[in-house]
Amino acid sequence: MDELPNRERAPRNRTITLSGEERERYSGKLLTLTHSMAPGELRNRTIHGDLLAILDFLPRRFVDLLFIDPPYNITKDFGAATFRRTTEEGYGNWFSSWFPRLLAVLKPTASVYICCDWRSAGVVQSIAEKHLIIQNRITWEREKGRGAKSNW
């Protein structure tokens, strides 16, 4: 796993970080998928990998709760990969390219939480509601982050 840069954090930042020793101890417990596995082999395990690369290895209809936090529609480096900001239509096309494939792993009674930025929330919801029943949207005020003061 890549090391995060050691930088000064804002006084109210509560980001959890691991020491080198903790990273070594916990990374040994991560599961890297290279082939299909039965639900019992995955239960109570933490899978480490690129979702799009391992999606076809996941069993069908075994997920009770899906929490996804895809890249927001901003240009950002993620270690070796970079996500580039695009148009709303482009972001929707990208989201649609993988999101429906993910639904096969859900149990019929599963709950899904999707994180997104306020600019992309509309397109994400319009795609999600083609496949799911939307119960609620959760929005919270962030006191940190880009433009937080001017957003509220």
Regions found by a protein language model. Name each.
Residues 1-152:
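Core catalytic lobe of class I
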